[in-house]
A protein has these predicted regions:
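Feature responds to low-complexity, polar/acidic, surface-exposed segments characteristic
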Residues: 1-17, 24-52, 61-81, 89-111, ...
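C-type cytochrome heme c attachment motif
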Residues: 85, 114
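Alpha-helical segment that forms one wall of the substrate-binding/catalytic cleft
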Residues: 139-145
């Protein structure tokens, strides 16, 4: 979740490979392990690459797709439309998907954007637009996923002082709570429908076995 230099880079764009890996980790463990593969048709996602199993498994499940059958473009920043499409494929709940943004009519991902919005994964801007071709930052992605998982601490008192902190995620930043939530493994108790209060920090899952 963080980088080797100790930063978390909340305002950096999130890549297609990073997004695939996030949703790979959100899979039910039985589904993830039952479909785990390191094989794919992409020439730019190969054996030994850190994201190979994540991308390969998610492609096998049909949740992510390449630019073409041979090109995944793992390091490219993901757009809001591409992110919405992954959300819409990942979440199998039924919805009518009637959310209508003013700038998605005729867009290649119009149906998936509407579905992802109806499911609560994504939201538009106050002016009624979705801006499908804009890139998503790491902080925005964390916030969206936390919201859907109903994992939203409401203030600093809901956190624990011994948590991992980041020099580029300050308490005054709009994304502070979302980033702390997404980057610290912990137990918690509920506060309302979507809020939570941390009760204990826990060891982070060992994801290296999937690299």
């Amino acid at each position: 979740v963080g980088y080797s230099d100790g930063t978390v880079r909340p305002n950096a764009n999130i890549s297609r490979a990073e997004t695939a890996t996030i949703f790979f980790r959100l899979l039910n463990a039985d589904i993830r392990d039952g479909n785990l593969t390191a094989e794919n048709t992409f020439t730019d996602v190969v054996d030994g690459q850190w994201c190979n199993k994540s991308v390969s498994t998610m492609a096998k499940l049909g949740i992510v797709k390449g630019r073409t059958a041979e090109i995944f473009d793992p390091n490219a920043p993901i757009t809001r439309a591409e992110f919405a499409v992954i959300c819409a494929r990942f979440d199998t709940k039924q919805t009518n998907g009637n959310n209508n943004f003013s700038d998605i009519s005729g867009h290649w991902a119009e149906a998936e954007i509407k579905r992802a919005a109806a499911l609560g994964w994504i939201a538009g801007y106050p002016d009624g637009t979705f801006r499908p071709n804009d890139y998503i930052t790491r902080a925005q992605a964390m916030t969206m996923i936390n919201r859907v998982l109903c994992r939203m601490p409401q203030d600093e008192e809901d956190l624990l002082g011994s948590m991992v902190v980041w020099p580029d995620n300050k308490p005054t930043d709009w994304h502070y709570l979302a980033v702390q939530e997404a980057t610290n493994s912990h137990d918690f108790k509920r506060k309302g429908e979507v809020g939570e209060k941390w009760t204990k920090l826990t060891s982070a899952p060992d994801w290296t076995k999937y690299q």
